[in-house]
Amino acid sequence: MSKNYNKRQAETAAKTAAPAATQKKGKGSRKGLHIGGRTVYAVLGLLLLFFCVWEFSPVLRHLAEENYFSFEALPMAYVLREPLGHVLWIGRFLMLPFHWQWVGGLYLAALLVISGWLADKALACKAQWRGIGFVLPAMLLAWASWRGYNLFLRNEPSLLILWLWGLLIVSALAAGVKGLLRKKTAEETAEEPVRWYKAGGLWLSTIALLAVIGGTYAFRQNVILSCDMQNKMMDADWEGMVDDALAARQPDRSVAAYHAIALNHQGQLLEHVFDIDYNYPTVKLDSIGGMDEGVNYIAESNFHCGLVQSGYHYAMEQHVMGGPRLRFLKLMALASMVNDERELCERYLHFIEKMPFEGEFCENVRNLLGNAKAIADEPTFGRILQFLPREQKFEQNFRTPPFLGYNVGVLSGTDETLNTSVAAALYSKDMENIIMRSQYLQQKRTLPLCVQQALVIASFKRPGLLDNFKGISSYVQNEVVNFATIAAPLSKDKSEKGKEAMRQALVKDWKGTYMFYYYCGNLNQTAQKQTQTNVN
């Protein structure tokens, strides 16, 4: 009897111990195999932080320059007249943190993380779908990336921040209503870790965010780089601007223009202007006041090549057509300062200082205003003064855009203007102009390599031309002939496809030479056609 009793007791103990052992085993198996809510939100938050702070922050900083905000109604009259004008006014106020690049990135990331977390709460999905709410911030970022230049060029710059705050408010309201209507149980509020391969919400949101990060890098590199170059231009970081241009896989006109501005300030324009590839991509812009990409760079290019009045005029046109933008107000103030128009400059400074955080800019301008020596001694403005026109002619006398048309057509100027005029002729592939200006240039300095290469190309149809130029080495002549020999069989196909095939075959070994630019560069004229009155 005792044996049967002991047997039954052992069986009971075994049955009791089995679930405990299973439970213990289950708890132990969660280590490294299960993902909790904190891990989900940490991973997605880091991805958003990476995009907002590291990748997209230059665009946010430039958005601050495309913005204008004042607490007073009169300076904001243009905005207030628009439909939902007061909403746009609030949106422009909410953009103010973008004034600091890293603060703006953190601000954007915080809004997106909170929105995603609140959307998750509103959806109240099962544990394996935790994090699915972050698909909404990913979709908003995908829209911002897809818009590209249209996010701010001739469009209301506050749309992005308004959409962000709208998403946050809607998510908060939805989460609040969900919390009121449904009482949380202990099971729902528990951590509820799930196996990593079952974390569908995390996987979907991660894939969506990685797609946005990768797509922005692949298709919107020029937007980010041009914004970064404009930001660096405000700090006179010419070397940083050049580095940005060299990093571009296929620079657009904006990147090329700011690259030239930086090289000009470094005094290296003719030495390095053809270091980048001038195979311009087609930029798709909204047809708002025109589809010309030039609105992004013409005013600054005119100003920094010494055409101060032309830069002022272009900025004023955009100011009138598109409403107040800090970027154009600052340029008009600087142009007025350089032209010693003190009252006009003070007028623009009056508007600028109504915007928060712009006191330092106004103070710096006022310290120079009316002091010709101080302006000449300041590196950036002193350099601009060296390029001021010596000919008294109207803008209409030259092809557009002025910073190219003037330098192609100018007949007299300073030694510095001679450099820019040669560069403009090289860019325009105007051989007669190149030959004429190079004759003057060789009297001032040793001919740069790109000029020597251009003259050798010109000599193919002008025997004896090189006799007029000293210092063109046999090495340069042989190099150009070598290029022509390699390119000749590739140039037989005159179709667009054939030209692109030729460019691809030569770009690796010959990019950076004038031969490559002359035969393979700046051929895509779909976005900005070259005519008798325009320079592409």
Please give the residue ranges for each predicted region:
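N-terminal membrane topogenic signal
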Residues: 28-44, 127-129
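Alpha-helical transmembrane segments of polytopic membrane proteins
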Residues: 37-41, 77, 101-110, 157-171, ...
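Aromatic-anchored segments of alpha-helical transmembrane domains
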Residues: 48-53, 136-148, 208-214
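Membrane-interface coil-to-helix junctions
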Residues: 53-94, 98, 102-103
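Juxtamembrane "helix-exit" motif on the non-cytosolic side of transmembrane helices
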Residues: 55-64, 143-156
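Transmembrane-helix motifs of polytopic, lipid-linked glycan transferases
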Residues: 109-127, 141-145, 171-175
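Internal/C-terminal transmembrane anchor helices
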Residues: 195-220
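Soluble catalytic regions of membrane-associated enzymes that act on cell-envelope
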Residues: 220-388, 392, 409-430
